[in-house]
Design a protein with these regions (language model features):
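A Zn2+-metalloprotease active-site environment signal
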Residues: 124-453
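SH3/SH3-like (including bacterial SH3b) beta-barrel domains
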Residues: 36-50, 56-59
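Short N-terminal segments immediately surrounding and downstream of signal-peptide cleavage
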Residues: 22-41
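Bacterial N-terminal signal peptides
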Residues: 6-15
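Sec/Tat signal peptide C-region and signal peptidase I cleavage site
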Residues: 16-21
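Boundary regions of SH3-family modules and the immediately adjacent low-complexity/disordered segments
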Residues: 29, 43, 55, 59, ...
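Positively charged n-region of N-terminal signal peptides that target proteins for export
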Residues: 1-5
Length: 453
């Protein structure tokens, strides 16, 4: 188990008007207008061209205050420049980080032995039912999410998203039934549709036996949308409860309420608003987040502390919400099951009369693998798609899609060797690659929403 040396994150986390330790950045666009105030209609100070170097001294909303030639200052939007990757983490890199977030109360954050949750911990961690009950107890309904939006003047906006999956639906469970891990209705259905997927997963290594197992499972064990929904709802608490067994919820009731209200509002703008969405902040200084099947989303305290606004919180949650909407980790579990059990176990568990699979699949899966699936790297396209979805969800939620870019910039400034980013870097594309993809894609139909406060 790797233990990192003492890392001092000493920052003055600032309200408007104070100054950041400067962060180097480079102009990304052919031309960028520098404004006198953080408004698009503010007077123009100058125009910068691609490759020009600037120093960021502060962030206000989704604008950076920058220093340009001869000591002049002005404002550019967060996607006009690209923060330079810090070469290595240390006191200097951390001081330079854009920490104007939740911890921006004039306090100094000192983290000793920063160590992210690793795969072995998640595999071995026991389900913490008390913590799981607490997370579920913090859950709010769609009406509470809408009330949050009304308080802040946010209005739902219709924004098309062709890549969004219309997931399987399921009735929202009661608090009592949701608090207890539930068995899947048809565990074998987990294997049922994998014949067409096995080749891409195992390639030539699978061999004829594995392919036959997949084909047989696909023919013998049908799977309906209702079965998929039941399996996701059963797996979610089992996996989230084990993440909470590795790291408990952060003891900050207001922060937990905040992420649930924001998260529920954003989730209501997706194609799966009826999932029993539950959000939580776990007490670990790392910068990461997790999405378990069935609408369970956990954010590490280290990431939450970076976020300076509700829109930045929504950006992080939106990325994870997309993984739930698209069933990304559920699909990983399906592949693991097929690769692990194969033809013999699949057929052994099939009832010849009904074609269903006996046993508590969700618990059996969790007992074998724990919550290690949370640190399984998804296909890069799935991560890029979740970034795009987060921008869509921000726009639909009445917020500014640029908030995601601001979050990625903050993480970028932590450095390529950041201990706090170690696990995230193992499971996600490089941060600069993610921003490159956003830049190439552009905002197109989302452009009008990038002018929002």
């Amino acid at each position: 188990m790797r233990v990192y040396p003492l890392i001092l994150i000493a920052t003055t986390l600032l309200a408007w008007g104070a100054a950041f330790a400067q962060v180097s950045a480079v102009v990304q666009k052919p031309t960028v207008e520098v404004h006198a105030q953080p408004r698009l209609d503010a007077p123009k100070v100058t125009t910068l061209t691609r490759g020009a170097s600037v120093s960021i001294s502060a962030q206000q909303g989704l604008w950076y205050q920058v220093q340009i030639a001869a000591g002049a200052t002005g404002f550019v939007r967060v996607n006009d420049v690209r923060v330079s990757y810090a070469g290595a983490e240390g006191e200097e890199a951390n001081v330079r980080a854009l920490f104007d977030g939740k911890s921006g109360e004039g306090r100094v954050t000192e983290t000793a032995g920063v160590r992210g949750i690793d795969e072995s911990e998640l595999k071995l961690a026991a389900l913490d039912q008390t913590q799981l009950n607490a997370m579920i107890g913090n859950r709010v309904d769609a009406a509470a999410g809408a009330a949050y939006a009304a308080e802040r003047g946010l209005q739902a906006t219709s924004v098309a998203y062709a890549a969004e999956t219309k997931g399987a639906s399921a009735a929202e469970p009661t608090e009592a039934t949701a608090a207890k891990p539930r068995p899947a209705k048809s565990a074998g259905a987990l294997l049922g549709s994998l014949g067409r997927e096995l080749g891409s997963m195992l390639g030539d290594k699978a061999g004829p036996t594995a392919t036959t197992a997949a084909d047989t499972a696909a023919k013998v064990i049908p799977k309906s949308d209702a079965e998929v929904a039941a399996e996701e709802l059963a797996l979610g608490p089992e996996i989230a409860g084990r993440v909470l067994g590795a790291r408990p919820l952060w003891n900050d009731a207001e922060a937990q309420r905040r992420v649930n209200r924001i998260g529920r509002w954003v989730a209501s703008q997706t194609s799966r608003p009826d999932l029993p969405w539950a959000f939580g902040i776990i007490d670990t200084p790392e910068v990461n987040a997790y999405a378990a099947p069935g609408g369970f989303v956990l954010v590490a305290r280290g990431l939450y502390d970076l976020l300076s606004s509700d829109s930045e919180v929504a950006a992080v949650l939106g990325h994870e919400i997309s993984h739930c909407v698209q069933s990304d980790h559920y699909n990983v579990i399906r592949k693991q099951e097929l690769a692990s059990y194969g033809k013999e176990l699949a057929l052994k568990d099939v009832d010849a009369t009904t074609g269903s699979v006996a046993g508590d699949h969700a618990r059996r899966y969790a007992e074998q693998y724990g919550a290690a699936v949370m640190l399984t790297a998804l296909d890069r396209e799935a991560e890029y798609r979740s970034d795009e979805a987060a921008e869509i969800y921000l726009a639909r939620s009445g917020m500014n899609p640029l908030a995601l870019y601001a979050v990625l910039q903050k993480m970028m400034s932590l450095g390529v060797e950041s201990a706090s980013l170690a696990q995230l870097q193992k499971t996600h594309p490089p941060l600069d690659s993610r921003m490159d993809r956003i830049d190439r894609r552009g905002y197109a139909a989302l452009e009008p929403y990038t002018a929002r406060d």
